[in-house]
Amino acid sequence: MCTRNKKDITTEYLNSKKIDRELKQESTTLQPLKLLLLGSGECGKSTIFKQIISFQDEATKKEYTPPSDYVIKNIFLNILTATSTFVRVAPSYNIEFSEEENQKIQSILNVFSDLENLDQTVFTSVSDNIKYLWNSKQIQSIYNNTNRIFQLNDSTEYLMSNIDRYSKPFKPTQNDFLRVRVKTTGIVEADFKIEAVPFKLVDVGGQKNQRRKWIHCFQDITCVLFVTSINDYDTLLEEDNSTSRFTDSLELFREMVNSNWFTKSPFVLFFNKIDLFKEKIKRIPVSQHLKDFNGNDHSYEETSQFIKNKFHTTIKNSNKIVYHHFTCALDSRAIEVVFNSIQHSLLMNVAEIL
């Protein structure tokens, strides 16, 4: 049996304290470890950004967490947007509404056309009408249709199921904060320290019209966190209904992972929204949209590995460091485990330099 004597333990402790002191001294001169979040629109990047911030100290969380009234207004906006989307696409599904339902719809659309004045009182005035429509057979048939011809926030069902709570003054929960959709435009940055080492986390808008701004963020990247929604194998881009989200994400990854900007930067590839993916493959065959898949359409293991391999085969440099994780960005514990692994590797590299 191998034992460690008191001298070994003391030496290890002193070495650890020495590294801590050196890190603290060097933190004033160290360049931040720059983490860049990349991915197509609505892949879950911003949710991962929110999660990473939530793992930091209280001061960092306070600085980068938006105020409650901002979150509340966007919850209302998400719900109104989903409702108006259902109404807009109803004719495409040969769905008609009664005169009473049309009156309820009109009251909602009146609010949607005057978002400047959207507040708790205004939302409450139409919340019963929204709830009525959401629970109607017409809207549910549109929502559950496997051939969707429209884009919808993944959190729609969650938000709609909480309308009663949102109909009176409330304090947003962490789950509300993670699920509310606010489209990222431009560049969002957060600075924080972990074990006295400075980090900079950068999130950029994923829509095609936002990508021209990305190049301003490409210098001195320590690690790229690339997020793809594994659930989007059957979905078209919101901004381009002729291109599938899967193809767009795959081509974007191919471009980024082989870019000269990131020759020395490791990649962490998040196959996100596995919770939705597991449910979707029960209803919508992967082979129906990814024609070269010839495995079991209902097997999570086979379908997820096939998609993972599609991404990995785009990597031209066999020495390129690319880690991958299958994730649900809403699962705080799982994302924390992944981020702890990332930060541990990066901090070890810093310690080796000192």
Curated annotation (Swiss-Prot):
Stretches for region G4 motif: 268-275
Recorded GO MF terms: G protein-coupled receptor binding; G-protein beta/gamma-subunit complex binding; GTP binding; GTPase activity; metal ion binding
Segments for region (G2 motif): 176-184
InterPro entries: Gprotein_alpha_su, GproteinA_insert, P-loop_NTPase
A Pfam family: G-alpha
UniProt KW tRNA processing keyword: no
SMART domains according to UniProt: G_alpha
BP-aspect Gene Ontology terms: adenylate cyclase-modulating G protein-coupled receptor signaling pathway
Entry keyword set: GTP-binding, Magnesium, Metal-binding, Nucleotide-binding, Transducer
Gene3D superfamilies recorded: GI Alpha 1, domain 2-like (1.10.400.10), P-loop containing nucleotide triphosphate hydrolases (3.40.50.300)
PANTHER family: GTP-BINDING PROTEIN ALPHA SUBUNIT (PTHR10218), GUANINE NUCLEOTIDE-BINDING PROTEIN ALPHA-12 SUBUNIT (PTHR10218:SF200)
Function summary: Guanine nucleotide-binding proteins (G proteins) are involved as modulators or transducers in various transmembrane signaling systems.
Name of the protein in its database record: Guanine nucleotide-binding protein alpha-12 subunit
Gene: gpaL
